[in-house]
Regions:
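Conserved nucleotide-binding/hydrolysis micro-motifs of P-loop NTPases
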Residues: 47, 55-57, 93-96, 197-201, ...
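Glycine-rich phosphate-binding loop of nucleotide-binding enzymes
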Residues: 135-228, 439, 487, 508
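Loop/turn-to-beta-strand initiation segments
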Residues: 188-192, 342-345, 389-393, 422-428
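P-loop NTPase motor domains
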Residues: 198-210, 227-415, 481-491
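Conserved catalytic network of the ASCE P-loop NTPase/AAA+ motor domain
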Residues: 156-157, 183-187, 217-220, 339-340, ...
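Conserved ATP-driven motor cores of ASCE-family P-loop NTPases powering translocation/secretion/packaging/pilus
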Residues: 78, 417-499
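Basic- and hydrophobic-enriched, low-structure N-terminal and domain-boundary segments
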Residues: 1-165, 174-179, 386-388, 409-410
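Conserved P-loop NTPase motor module
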Residues: 482-527
Length: 527
């Protein structure tokens, strides 16, 4: 079927509920698929929309009681007339008119008239709406059942915090790796990746096939630094690392322990005791607490003995982490900042230390200090109206552990998400349980990319606050279990279901070919 082939005509609809399209007899309903694009030719403008449902209808209910069973000729005569197929189309954009000539496709504010012809969207239509691949736009894949490139403006993406969601095994890691490569290629931002399963630094795994694929350091050796918490594991995997991370006890703050309350099974009283110890002993509170053996000291601190024993068990869990030392040999935050300030991207691999305690502690501790540095630099840049820091995207996995309703208001990650791009720092969060993330945080995400989700709660959470939620629910529910995703939000003019581009067999289009961004462009990006 030609891409310009007429599919049918508009028969009913509304702006809020969508448009009903009656298929022509020549158009096979089996060729129609939820998530595909169509254009509607109105009298004054064209409308660009997405198929959100496919159905069958009849003009005479008697046909459903006495269908022409076994009579191919009669079936052919009735199909398209008395019996027909219908499409439900959600209109998103208008193309044409004086506004479009100046500003491009516009959000839809009206609907086409009765009997307006409906066609499949062409490659030219997709390029008009989403743009062509260039020095700013990055090719992320293809719209469902189309060969045209779907491109994303990564500088626009990096201006807000974003999320990648999907149940286990649907391709979240692949999509994350692809977006990180895009941010590198287009120099849209620098990345700090807290890499729980060592997928983004030197090499990753090809989901579903088990084989290794190149990750950021191999593709961009001069632009990526790999930090590791587990030097032995990195050497065994043949990874070229730039820094071995050690965390000193004096770097641990009460906020870090508070975030670990559930993980360490701490009581509220035990968390409050941490703040009391910090006030009394200062930065050396952790070591001082380890040395407390008598009840008199606890009485002086107004800490109950059972509370202290609960806290000590949690502290012992942290103390046993191999990368925790009494005195760190160097300042890891200063080292990370030096790389970021020079335009290099940092991937922190956790190696064998994939326990959630280690991940939450390290990610929160480092992010808090890095954010403070970016805040100071941005405030100075605003005062001087120059020298803005390069936008920083911080990537975290298992995001619901940092951003659930119980802790989101207290963590640095919640602060970053709520402030959007105020201090040149945004988040890229990856999670298979979006329902576990605080509603306010979800509402602050600029762009969401979601693979297949099973739970109704997760689907509702990822689509919360989105116009046309029910229609997108149908699209999301029909995605394949692998290699299909739905993207919507700030960085795209309208939702689009797509197949991500191929990665892992040929790296010719993925390597070190990024154009550099000037200081003026960086300043413009954050104004």
């Amino acid at each position: 079927m030609s891409m310009e082939h007429k599919l049918g005509i508009v028969t009913a609809g509304s702006l809020n509920k969508g448009i009903e399209v009656k298929l022509d007899g020549a158009a096979s309903i089996e060729d129609m698929a939820v998530g595909r694009y169509v254009t509607i030719e109105g009298h004054k403008r064209r409308f660009f929309g997405m198929i959100t449902d496919v159905s069958l209808g009849v003009t005479d209910l008697a046909l459903t009681v006495s269908p022409p069973s076994g009579d191919d000729f009669l079936s052919e005569v009735l199909t398209g007339t008395s019996a027909y197929g219908s499409l439900h189309v959600a209109p998103y954009l208008t193309i044409g008119g004086t506004e479009t000539a100046v500003d491009g496709p516009q959000p839809v504010k009206t609907i086409p008239g009765h009997f307006s012809p409906v066609k499949e969207a062409s490659a030219a239509d997709i390029e008009l709406v989403f743009g062509k691949e260039d020095d700013k736009k990055f090719w992320i894949g293809n719209p469902l059942d189309m060969e045209v490139k779907l491109c994303l403006d990564l500088q626009t993406l990096a201006r807000r915090s974003n999320g990648i969601f999907g149940k286990s095994g649907t391709g979240k890691t692949f999509l994350t790796r692809m977006l990180l490569i895009g941010l590198l290629q287009k120099s849209a931002a620098v990345n700090l990746v807290f890499d729980m399963h060592s997928e983004y630094g030197w090499a990753g795994t090809f989901e579903g096939k088990g084989r290794k694929v190149k990750a950021l350091k191999q593709l961009f050796p001069s632009k990526v630094a790999v930090f590791t918490l587990d030097e032995e594991n990195s050497k065994r995997r043949g990874v070229s690392t730039d820094y071995v991370v050690r965390i000193g006890l004096e770097e641990i703050e009460p906020e870090d322990i508070s975030l670990l309350r559930q993980t360490l099974n701490l009581t509220d009283a035990a968390v409050e005791a941490v703040y009391q110890l910090r006030r009394h002993y200062g930065k050396g509170w952790f070591s001082a607490a380890e040395g407390i053996e008598d009840s008199e000291t606890l009485e002086e601190l107004k800490i109950h003995e059972s509370t202290f024993q609960n806290l000590r068990r949690g502290m012992n869990t942290i103390r046993r982490l191999p990368f925790i030392t009494p005195n760190a040999p160097g300042d890891v935050v200063d080292s990370i900042l030096k790389y970021l300030e020079s335009g290099k991207h940092v991937v922190l691999e956790f190696g064998r230390y994939t326990d959630i305690t280690a991940y939450i502690l390290v990610a929160n501790l480092l992010t808090r200090r890095i954010y403070a540095s970016y805040r100071d630099r941005t405030e100075k840049a605003v005062a001087a109206d120059t020298g803005y820091p390069t936008p920083l995207v911080i990537t975290i996995e298992e995001a619901h552990k940092f951003l659930n309703s119980g802790v989101a208001s207290q963590t640095i990650f919640g602060t970053i998400a709520r402030e959007m791009r105020k201090y040149s720092v945004t988040l890229l969060i990856i999670d298979q349980r979006p329902s576990g993330i605080d509603d306010e945080i979800m509402s602050q995400l600029g762009t969401r990319i979601t693979c297949l989700l099973d739970s109704e709660k997760d689907i509702d959470a990822v689509l919360s606050g989105v116009s046309g939620k029910n229609e997108l629910k149908n699209v999301l529910a029909k995605l394949s279990a692998r290699q299909q995703a739905l993207i919507f939000g700030h960085a795209v003019p309208m939702p689009v279901a797509f197949t991500p581009r191929e990665y892992g067999s040929n790296y010719g289009d993925w390597g070190e070919a990024a154009a550099k961004v000037s200081d003026e462009e960086i300043e413009d990006l954050w104004k």
